[in-house]
Curated annotation (Swiss-Prot):
Storage protein of egg white. Lacks protease inhibitory activity. This is Ovalbumin. Transmembrane segments: none annotated. It comes from the Eukaryota.
Amino acid sequence: MGSIGAASTEFCFDMFKELKVHHVNENIIYSPLSIISILSMVFLGARENTKTQMEKVIHFDKITGFGESLESQCGTSVSVHASLKDILSEITKPSDNYSLSLASKLYAEETYPVLPEYLQCIKELYKGSLETVSFQTAADQARELINSWVETQTNGVIKNFLQPGSVDPQTEMVLVDAIYFKGTWEKAFKDEDTQEVPFRITEQESKPVQMMYQAGSFKVATVAAEKMKILELPYASGELSMFVLLPDDISGLEQLETTISIEKLSEWTSSNMMEDRKMKVYLPHMKIEEKYNLTSVLVALGMTDLFSPSANLSGISTAQTLKMSEAIHGAYVEIYEAGSEMATSTGVLVEAASVSEEFRVDHPFLFLIKHNPSNSILFFGRCIFP
């Protein structure tokens, strides 16, 4: 398999299988890449069985040369962490083309001594950090401190990240991971073309949405065998693209969810499937925000020791008993008209008249936002209603 992109994609689908069981007929949005990166920070300090389980769940065990290269003082092969750091630095560097804010941090109970070399390693490899707080004597103040940090990091978008009661005096360590994204399209949708139309949630139920429109040349794949089609919408940077996987039928989502896999997705989005076609594209405004307690998901995937008294985090702390108490992930994605270049009105008028094919996103679909250079899935989602 051999790469971070493949490992994060495989983890992405494992996670989706778990989430869809617990979130039937609900929107889903999460960032596999951001979850893998913060789990990798924990992984640096995990030892023995805890480490082996983590390696399997995040598919690091399949990365070529993973165990061999450079056993550094950070206790694991540096190559994986270096390539993750490169991808994350690339994606999170300030850009005019999109806003992406990431708030990822570990918070540990201050009575646990944290090894200075661990702090050094996560700083070098991830620009990451672990902060000690007093859960034992001031759990609610710790929660408020965490929430205000997440809010600041995401420019006020993600508020009240940890709910009251989510930490208590018994809390030992919390993994916090929140990510916000709003991109600028390579080709903008024009505000005046947006209209209110019904979005058909089921055969019986529909709700009004703001539907954007543009006509132009887009990469599209028709997957007749699966009764669905795929549209790629590039963001202005050229490095990120959104892929919309749209079933032909209103009720076709379940079949698509059952079929999708890492192999299928790479086949469907390969260059011999995706072709440039003139297309009228209708895409709804979207504002999807979800939050998950990842503890149950990760345990179900096989990462059991980390959250139990059997945890071995001796690379983080000399305390024998340290375990992860909670892992919380939140993702927020907004989809609007804004683009870097406006389509010229005359060109569009001519083109629209000559275009007969439509890609009309007016019923439930899957979508993903991909970092093309590393082939990594930054966001994966299911939209039941935008």
